[in-house]
């Protein structure tokens, strides 16, 4: 943001971080992709930000970066063990910017395993 974040920006980041955690936790074999999206979307709805989340939660990753299954509010597929998917909730304010937190996961019986992680917490860097 080019300066210290405002309280609104910090709240927006915290909401997206919580939505990300909910989406990751929901990534279990046999789970409907729409249910995974709904877990993250519920967090944003409770924070009054659902209308600012304008895309699906994620997608499969394989030979191409964007593959099936879609993980969205319109998804029809089911997540299976050993699938590689992204979880990437975001909230955007027109003319101001937004926050997106994205990780790539392998779906496993014991729970999702992160292949990437941006870490947690808001990091403010100087310009």
Language-model segments: residues:
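Active-site neighborhoods and metal-handling regions in enzymes and metal-associated proteins
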Residues: 1-127
């Amino acid at each position: 943001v080019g300066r210290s974040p405002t309280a609104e920006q910090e709240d927006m980041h915290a909401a997206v971080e919580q939505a990300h955690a909910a989406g990751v936790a929901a990534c279990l074999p046999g789970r409907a992709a729409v249910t995974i999206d709904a877990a993250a979307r519920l967090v944003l709805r409770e924070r009054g930000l659902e209308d600012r989340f304008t895309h699906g939660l994620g997608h499969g990753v394989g030979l191409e970066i964007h593959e099936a299954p879609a993980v969205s509010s319109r998804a029809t597929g089911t997540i299976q063990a050993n699938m590689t998917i992204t979880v990437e909730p975001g909230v955007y304010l027109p003319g101001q910017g937004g926050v997106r937190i994205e990780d790539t996961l392998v779906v496993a019986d014991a729970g999702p395993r992160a292949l990437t992680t941006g870490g947690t917490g808001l990091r403010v860097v100087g310009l």
